C-alpha cells in the first residue's frame, strides 16, 4: 500500500463510471484508502447504483456527482480513472482532464504499476472467462497461490496488496481494457517506457466479430486485441489458436519480438497443419479422436498426453479451452518451480497408446527432457481437472428434473458462441436464443439452428434480425417471447420427453436485462421455479 500512497496520497482523483460490476467500486475503495481526495461520477442516478453506493458508505470523504458529469470534476483532477465502457476517443471530459495535465488511468493500469506479481493474461472474443478461470484453477492445483481478476471477475485492485513475486495473477482482458492500456502507454511514452502489460504467458482465444456496434471495423477491434502480446519479449510465451484464421498473424507478429509461440487446437495435428503452417506442431497442444489432449513442448520432442479424457465440461470447445489453460499452467510451473532431480516425460509412457494411434504419424520423436514440465506436475493437474466443472454462465449445467437437463450459457453474446454450444452436445437440444443486436451476422446461426430439436426465441433487436433468416431457412420456432418466465412456461407445456435445454442467446442482453450475468441468473431462477 506504500506504493499506492506515494502515487495517490493527497492527489485529486476522479473516478469516471462507478458501475455495478465492481471495477469502479474497487478503484474507489483503493484510492480512498490510499489517501486520495476522491470524486466519483456516473451518468446513472443513485437508485441504479445502489449496490456500489452501499459499499462506499464506509468512506464518508468521497464526493459523488451522479446523474451527470461536470467538467470541473475533470479539469481539477490530477488523476482520472475511467471505466472501460467509457469511450476515450473524442470524450469531452477526458479531453478536458488531459488539457489540464491530468493522467488517465484504469483499475488495470494501476494494478500493473503497483503489483510485483508474475502475470498471465487471456484475451480473445469468446472463451476468455472460461480459459482464465481454468488457468487460475490449474495454477492453484499445482500449488501456486494464484489470483484471478479482470473483465468478468473482480477488479485486481481488490487483491493487489496481497500480491508478491510468488503469487501469479491471471488477468482476463477485454478489447476495451486493452485499448485503455494502449492509451495509458501513449501518455507514458518515453525512450525508456516498454509498456505496462507484459505477461509472461498470454493466451489468445479465437477471434469473432464482436462489438461491431462499437468498432468501425474488424481491423480496429483486432488491433486492440494485439495489445495483449505487443510488449512481450524473448522470455515470454504466447498461445495461439490454430483453428482461428487470425492465429497465424498473431504468431508472426509475436515471433518478430522473439516471443515463444505455442499453438493449441481442437483438431488433430494433420488437420490443424493444413489450416496453418507445416511447422505449426513444433510446439503445440492438440486433441486426439478419443478426447485426450497431447502436447509437444519443443521441436524434436516426443508427443505426450497432457489431459486424459475425463473432463466434465461439455464439448470440444470448452474442453480445448481447459486444455490450453492447463498447458499454460504447466509452462508457468516449468519456468518457476521445476525441481532439478525429476524425470520429465509427462505421460510419455502412454505415447504409444491407442490414443496416439489415431494420428497418421507415429511418435518417433526424441523423448523430451528439459523442455517438458515434470511428470508430477502433469499427473497432479490431470487429476485435479477431472473434477473441474467450468464456471457460471458458460455452458453451466445447473439443474435436472424429470429427465430434463438445463444448461445456462448466458455469456454467449455472439452467434458463433451459440453455434459452438450446439456442437458441444452429441444429441439434439432444445435451444433458447435471442436478445440485443451487436451488428453481428446471424445467417450462420439460422442455418445451425436447424440442428436443434426445438427452437425458442427471446425478444430483442437481434431476434428481429434472426426471424426472417429462420423463415428463409425453413427452421420452425416458438416465440418470440417478451420474458424468460413466459418462454419457460410455454416450453414446459410443450416438452413431454427427456432432453437437454440450452439457453445460449447469441446476442447481448440490454433490452431486457442489465447485463448477461443478470440474464443468466434470471434464467436459472425461473427454471427452478417453473420446473420444480
UniProtKB/Swiss-Prot annotation:
Cell wall formation. Catalyzes the addition of glutamate to the nucleotide precursor UDP-N-acetylmuramoyl-L-alanine (UMA). The gene is murD. The keyword Cell wall biogenesis/degradation applies. ATP binds at residues 124-130. This is UDP-N-acetylmuramoylalanine--D-glutamate ligase. It is found in: Cytoplasm. It comes from Treponema pallidum (strain Nichols). Its main location: cytoplasm. HAMAP family: MurD. The lineage of its organism: Bacteria, Pseudomonadati, Spirochaetota, Spirochaetia, Spirochaetales. GO terms for biological process: cell division; cell wall organization; peptidoglycan biosynthetic process; regulation of cell shape. Pathway: Cell wall biogenesis; peptidoglycan biosynthesis.
